[in-house]
Amino acid sequence: MAELILEPYAVVQDWHLPGTDVRWESLLSEYLQRIAQRCAASGKCVIGHIKALSTFADQGYLRISVVAANIPASIEGKAPPRCVSLELTLNVLVYGLDRNIVEKITLETASEIARQRKGEVHQKNFPHASDHLFHSNQQNPSKGETQ
């Protein structure tokens, strides 16, 4: 069996959805579940962990986690009442898919969900995200090291 590579993907997304009845827990569960399903449909891969975290001024937080395309998301915490915007940190660990494919899946899925709800989502990549590619027996170009 060929070894599956891991190219971790991390991004910060700013979500804004109009209205006062945004159910972030179910919306973000749907988002992560769709990411997992689309990753699974994109080729031979193993979903390690897809997780998202949003923190709020009242010291609250919302954490969503998915470990397989066919298992419902785990939810911890909740968004404050009448919350229409949030910053979401998303981490996607999927073995066997190129980072660019994962990035495309997350961006397209977020855009679809926001558009369906007449909202918007903008994303900011973490600096140096492309420096963290994990391929066995390949050189890490940012450090000149072999993994």
Residue ranges and their predicted role:
Residues 1-147:
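P-loop NTP-binding site
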